[in-house]
Amino acid sequence: MNALSPLGMVSELPSSNQMQSDAERTVVHNSDAEVQKDYFVEKDGVKFAGMHLLVDLWGATNLCDPDHIDRALREAAEAAGATILHGHFHHFSPNGGVSGVLVLAESHISIHTWPERDFAAIDIFMCGACDPYDGIPALKAAFQPERIDLDEQRRGIVA
């Protein structure tokens, strides 16, 4: 049984567990030099792991096309100064929504769309020198929302 079946959602593709065996998955390890760097952020005298933006787009367009959504998130990541490592997007039926993620060297950007509600929920979590706010204009241009609700969370506050 598909994990989405109880929710009334049917996937066009098998789950990633069905598509890839453990032997086929790729694990990338960083070099020792990268491990030694401190990617925590300091802003207004507060040190933390990274900035997490929760972005709700209301009255948005272009929410059914995985290729368009992939390009939009890539443009947002690049504008924020992030390094894209990997992307994966999945198109659902019957409503046409898309869920996807870009794995970044600095964390991730993810999206879930509900085209039947003209709504998209986007998470942008970044550490280091990246500024997730710099990616917002690319998202506005790509999805042309009537309204944006934004919440900022500083993750992993240490001082």
Which residue ranges define each predicted feature?
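Polybasic/polar functional segments that serve as interface/processing modules
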Residues: M1-A159
